Amino acid sequence: MKIAILSRDGTLYSCKRLVEAAEQRGHSIEVIDPLSCYMNINPAAPTIHYRGRQLERYDAVIPRIGSAMTFYGTAVLRQFELLGSYPLNESVAITRARDKLRSLQLLARQGIDLPITGFAHSPDDTGDLIELVGGAPLVVKLVEGTQGIGVVLAETRQAAESVIDAFRGLNAHILVQEYIREAQGSDVRCLVVGSKVVAAIERQAKPGEFRSNLHRGGTARKVSITAKERAIAVKAATTLGLDVAGVDILRAARGPLVMEVNASPGLEGVESTTGLDIAGRMIEYIEQRGRPGFRLKSGG
């Protein structure tokens, strides 16, 4: 198969592992910077150009699109979809997952358990918003944030009001969520490929920090998950239309809660912690699904 990876940096661990896994299976694979692509949106003969050359059709495309380039990156991915390339995560699914508010609403519609979450526009509603999620301590999140950026733990009501006002002063869209104290700064990252959880790790925040992201100094260990956690992870990924996803689960006293669904999960932490070949599982999935005649779930 002829495969493209959409990524700004082919030297990143995840990209290098995907290239390695594809080449080991005899596939041709190329890393393409989506910001260097430009398109002819023509119903008769659509094309994609890259650094002065017209790209030929690829059998499959693996999007590794960072949050900062979601708009243009998914536009490029849609053009590949238009040309008939199989996307490992469709453009529509990625945009759903990148919008934290929309994704939580979709998950809630399917009855998936979540931390209690509030969203409001008017400063006049701040007091009620804080009460809706059970009061302080609580978590304030930027809707557009990733890797723990724009996530603040407010331990008192006064701190919560100050943080919310500060974000509003920047015209930022924010979510207010209950703080799951019993999780003690840890979460479970489930790596979903297709309809299976292929790996799971527990991430623990560093001392003095509540965000467990590995990019923020958190640590990881291999962990066994329950049947309920496995089912909720697969259901969350399926609800957003993602073939590959990192589903982050908080172990609360009332049961597992989906905190976030990541459409472009990093492979380094999961592979190094578990010793599993996740990149290989992703390429195998492409081999199974990326055949001529496939249909987009969403219509593109």
Curated annotation (Swiss-Prot):
Which residues are noted in the entry as Mn(2+) 1-binding?
248, 260
Binding positions for Mg(2+) 1 per the UniProt entry: 248, 260
Q: Where are the transmembrane segments?
A: none
Q: How is the cofactor bound?
A: Binds 2 magnesium or manganese ions per subunit.
Q: What range(s) does the ATP-grasp domain occupy?
A: 104-287
According to the UniProt entry, its GO molecular function terms are: ATP binding; metal ion binding; ribosomal S6-glutamic acid ligase activity
Q: Which residues bind ATP?
A: 141, 178-179, 187, 211-213
Q: Which InterPro entries match?
A: ATP-grasp, ATP-grasp_RimK-type, ATP_grasp_subdomain_1, RimK, Rimk_N, Rp_bS6_RimK/Lys_biosynth_LsyX
tRNA-binding among keywords: no
Q: Which cofactor does it need?
A: Mg(2+); Mn(2+)
- Any signal peptide, and if so, which residues? none
The Gene Ontology biological process annotation of the record reads: protein modification process; SOS response; translation
Q: Which family does it belong to?
A: Belongs to the RimK family.
Q: What is this protein called?
A: Probable alpha-L-glutamate ligase
Q: What gene name is listed for this protein? A: rimK
